[in-house]
Regions:
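Short, small-residue-biased leader/transition segments that mark boundaries at the very start
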Residues: 1-8
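A short beta-loop-alpha structural element at the N-terminal edge
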Residues: 15-27
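Conserved acetyl-CoA-binding loop-helix of GNAT-fold acetyltransferases
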Residues: 105-121, 143-148
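A short, internal acetyl-CoA/4′-phosphopantetheine-binding micro-motif in the GNAT/acyltransferase core
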Residues: 96-105, 132-137
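Conserved GNAT acetyl-CoA-binding A-motif
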Residues: 120-142
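Acetyl-CoA-dependent GNAT
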Residues: 46-102, 113-114, 119, 123, ...
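Conserved GNAT-fold acetyl-CoA-binding loop/helix
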Residues: 28-55
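Conserved catalytic-core motifs of GNAT/GCN5-like acyltransferases
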Residues: 79, 131-133, 147, 151-170, ...
Length: 196
């Protein structure tokens, strides 16, 4: 169970914990690889550390921002943020996950994403969304691995935006995937902001 502040899973040497701003340099190092070498993010330029810390601060006002560590080294991170900045969307959250490019496909992503979903469910979030770059033909910048990862976790395709992202001289689709994790009621209680 990964619903507490610290989580140990069947991967005995890993820990999941809340991120802090002190983690920002390592988290940014992980993210920078994807900006510079992939279309997993549509961002062109690696943000400055100050800008990245500001993004983290904004997310942490309401949502969980988690890191996964192995032997004390951050190997990945995941967070949720507002799906759309309007009150009627409060029960929906967009999720983001990045693992160090050298440690993918070891089960860390699944454990980290499930820990994030557990925390969101405890907040009262009902709908999880993922915005994913998607290639018509896989290439050196983008595969379909992210879509397949989400599908294995129970996400389903909600929609496709065709040729909406341009990076490295090529056009890419963007897909939205969703997963419902709670009951939609006519008297829905408000979500509770995440507590650090």
């Amino acid at each position: 169970d990964c619903s507490s502040d610290v989580c140990s899973s069947d991967l005995s040497d890993i820990t999941i914990r809340n991120a802090t701003l002190a983690d920002a340099p390592r988290i940014l190092e992980i993210y920078a690889y994807y900006v510079e070498h992939t279309v997993i993010t549509f961002e062109y330029d690696v943000p400055s550390l100050a800008e990245f810390e500001g993004r983290m601060r904004d997310i942490m006002k309401k949502y969980p921002y988690l890191v996964i560590e192995r032997d004390g080294r951050i190997e990945g991170y995941a967070y949720a943020h507002a799906f759309v900045g309007r009150a009627a969307y409060d029960w929906a959250a967009e999720l983001t996950i990045y693992l160090d490019h050298d440690v993918r496909r070891g089960g860390l992503g699944r454990v980290l994403y499930e820990a994030l979903a557990d925390r969101l469910k405890a907040m009262g979030v009902l709908n999880l969304y993922a915005c994913i770059g998607y290639p018509l033909v896989e290439d050196e910048y983008l595969t379909r691995n992210s879509a397949q990862f989400h599908e294995h976790l129970g996400f389903t395709l909600a929609g496709t935006f065709h040729n909406c992202g341009y990076k490295f001289g090529r056009w890419y689709d963007m897909i939205w995937m969703e997963k419902i994790i709670g009951e939609h009621r006519p008297d829905q209680p408000d979500i509770v902001p995440y507590q650090y």
